[in-house]
UniProtKB/Swiss-Prot annotation:
Tissue: Expressed by the venom duct.
UniProt-recorded name of the protein: Conotoxin Im026
Signal sequence interval, chain numbering: 1-24
Keyword check for Secreted: yes
């Protein structure tokens, strides 16, 4: 069966009107009316972002007290004044 574009459009419109009231309890009520925008309010960002969407930031370790290099976070070194120096410490920024 081969349909032209016009026939396809007419068929789609008829199907839309035929199934328009499937989810409603009364005539004219559709699934779009039932939602009352609750779905969109859930999607809005409220509070902190989701854990896997947080930005990763590099922190400067300068000024952190240490006794040996083991006390400093990775990629930092303990200098002669017993302070960690260098850029290090990737962490999730809240």
């Amino acid at each position: 069966m081969r349909l032209t574009t016009m026939h396809s459009v007419i068929l789609m419109l008829l199907l839309v009107f035929a199934f328009d009231n499937v989810d409603g309890d009364e005539p004219g009520q559709t699934a779009r009316d039932v939602d009352n925008r609750n779905f969109m309010s859930i999607l809005r960002s409220e509070g902190k972002p989701v854990h896997f969407l947080r930005a990763i930031k590099k922190r400067d370790c300068t000024g952190q007290a240490c006794t040996t290099g083991d006390n400093c976070p990775s990629e930092c070194v303990c200098n002669e004044h017993h302070f960690c120096t260098g850029k290090c410490c990737y962490f999730l920024h809240a």
